[in-house]
């Protein structure tokens, strides 16, 4: 399993208590993919630029898609640009992929049996491993989860590459929150105009 998949599992597990913002999760999943691709030697970081290496299969469908979508010509993409491009709809892609491989199921409605409810994790080795990584306070997974709004920042030191990626993830999540707040303010102002205030 990958850090991105473990993060998706942790987020689905957490969603039973408090829903995780999908945009934030998509951005952090894209950051987790960068870190997984770094570990797989599919890319290297030059400052905040992503330089692709020779593609090699990782065994994970979504991670292989991520590696194939790396910009392979100069000027190479920055981590932040990657987060916004790759992150679009990524949380839904991970939920669908987890369901495809049998790690989640959709609960059925009691009154209308054809209607599907929320996505729920099944007991599996992948879920147990993700929970163990989180409980052990694995620094990268903990930092990514914190960026998505799940838990606190890790106390342990991170590698320079991880710090670079996590800083970009944090900036992107803050930018997304600013856009959300601006939209709420604009909508409230528009409503006030219609009410005559």
Residue ranges with predicted function:
Residues 116-197:
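Glycine-rich, aromatic-bearing surface loops/beta-hairpins
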Residues 41, 102, 148-152:
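Short glycine-centered helix-capping/turn motifs at secondary-structure transition points
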Residues 73-108:
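Ordered, amphipathic secondary-structure segments that act as subunit-interaction surfaces
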Residues 29, 89-90, 137:
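Residue-level preference for nonpolar/small residues embedded in alpha-helices
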Residues 34-37, 98, 141-146:
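Short, structured motif recognition centered on aromatic/hydrophobic residues
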Residues 47-67, 105-138:
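Accessory beta->alpha helical hairpin/"wing" motif in late/C-terminal subdomains of nucleic-acid enzymes
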Residues 1-85, 192-197:
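Short, amphipathic alpha-helical interface elements at domain boundaries
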